[in-house]
C-alpha cells in the first residue's frame, strides 16, 4: 500500500515551502513574524485585502508575494 502525502507546497516570494497543517494567510504571516501593518500581500496574482487574510486557507501550489513598506529619507 502506498502512503499518499498530504503535504502542500506553496511559494512565498518565489521560495518553496511545505506544510501538512491547515493554515490561513493571517497565521502564516504571524509564523514568519511579518508586521502586517507594513506590508502588501499578493495571493495567486491578486492583491489581497487584510480583512480576508483569516478566511483564505493555504492550498497546494499557492503563490504568495509579500512586499514590505520601508520608510526612510
Swiss-Prot record:
Keywords: Chloroplast, Plastid. CDD domains: Ubl_ThiS. Disulfide bonds: none annotated. It is found in: Plastid, Chloroplast. Pfam families: ThiS. SUPFAM superfamilies: MoaD/ThiS. One of its GO terms (cellular component) is chloroplast. NCBIfam families: thiS. Belongs to the ycf40 family. PANTHER family: SULFUR CARRIER PROTEIN THIS. This is Uncharacterized protein ycf40. It comes from Trieres chinensis (Marine centric diatom).
